[in-house]
Regions:
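Single conserved hydrophobic/aromatic residue that forms the stacking wall/gate
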Residues: 276-278, 282-297
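N-terminal cationic and glycine-rich segments that engage phosphates or anionic surfaces
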Residues: 2-66, 72-73, 77-120, 131-134, ...
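Phosphate- and divalent-cation-binding pockets in alpha/beta enzyme and binding domains
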Residues: 78-79, 171, 288
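Long, charge-patterned amphipathic alpha-helical coiled-coil/hairpin "stalk" segments used as oligomerization
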Residues: 87-194
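Residue-level signature of catalytic and energy-coupling elements of molecular machines
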Residues: 13, 69, 161, 213
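Histidine-centered active-site/metal-ligand motif
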Residues: 15-18, 188, 286
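Intrinsically disordered, compositionally biased charged tails
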Residues: 1-3, 226-281
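Short glycine/threonine-rich loop/turn motifs
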Residues: 171-234
Length: 297
């Protein structure tokens, strides 16, 4: 079953492309027709591409991989932030920092700087600074938070990029291509799909369009995360089973040993008792005989 249907896409305006004069010929396979000078995207192909991309994204999430969502255009920023956060993925919705991927160690240093400032605030070091220094550091922290706050948990290069408007985010796409990182993208009729690994032909200018596509993608990722969680629980249970079995066997063995010890002790006591009783009987007989002899005398 498809994750999106034709009617959903139609209602969200996913089919609206750009003016014919702005089109990119490489998008011809995904264009259904032209109407009033505007290209109309073939939604059946969009459905197929969404399903394909969603399945791959689901597997990435299931493997615990990180996917970086990128959308700096006004119409898509909030949608991307909400959807990416819902599945615990990093995102960039402000200006793309040059070298974000190709110079990732430098980006990590900037993120660590944020952590250092936070530590200064907690341990009281910040309070010992002058007003001017406090102001400078506060501004620096706010600037870093705005640009990098949403990727704090990205400790290594992402396994994939999901881009809304590949033309606007061409720097991000180029960096990913250079590093061999797969790119998923919502590609409109004015963009070049050749550098995108998983093309989703769609209107990237309408908020509803972005919301529908991302909704399907993130739903698939959430399924992958849930499956990963379930597998982890099963693995832990499978790991615990032999331990519980060993404990049960040890308890049974301990109980058996205790019973054997008790039986041995009881047998020993019984034997001693029987021996004492026999000895007592012999002594009694000896006394009786001695008394009889004495009487005869």
């Amino acid at each position: 079953m498809s994750r999106v249907n034709f009617d959903q896409l139609l209602e969200a305006g996913v089919h609206f492309g750009h003016l014919k004069r702005k089109w990119n010929p490489a998008m011809a396979p995904y264009i259904f027709m032209e109407r009033n000078g505007i290209h109309i995207i073939d939604l059946y192909k969009t459905v197929a591409k969404v399903d394909e991309a969603a399945e791959v994204m689901k597997n990435l999430a299931k493997q615990g991989k990180k996917v970086l969502f990128v959308a700096t255009k006004k119409q898509a920023k909030q949608v991307v932030a909400d959807k990416a956060a819902s599945v615990g993925m990093p995102y960039v919705i402000e200006r793309w920092p040059g070298g974000m991927l190709t110079n990732f160690p430098t980006i990590r240093k900037a993120i660590k700087k944020m952590a250092t400032i936070d530590k200064m605030t907690k341990d009281g070091t910040f309070d010992n600074l002058s007003k001017r220094e406090k102001l400078q550091i506060t501004r620096q922290r706010a600037k870093l938070e705005k640009t990098l706050g949403s990727i704090v948990d990205l400790t290594r290069l992402p396994s994939a990029l999901f881009v809304v408007d590949v033309m606007k985010e061409h720097i991000a796409v180029r960096e990913a291509n250079r590093l061999g990182i797969p790119v998923f993208g919502m590609v409109d009729t004015n963009s070049n799909p050749n550098n995108i690994d998983y093309v989703i032909p769609a209107n990237d200018d309408a908020t509803k369009s972005v919301e529908v596509i991302l909704g399907a993608i993130c739903e698939a990722m959430n399924e992958g995360l849930q499956e990963r969680k379930a597998e982890k629980i099963d693995a832990e249970a499978a790991e615990e089973a032999p331990k519980r079995e060993r404990k049960a066997k040890a308890a049974v063995k301990k109980e058996r040993t205790k019973k054997e010890d008790d039986d041995a002790l009881n047998a020993n006591v019984a034997g001693k008792f029987a021996k004492d009783r026999k000895s007592t009987r012999l002594n009694s007989s000896h006394i009786t005989i001695s008394y009889a002899v004495f009487c005869l005398k």
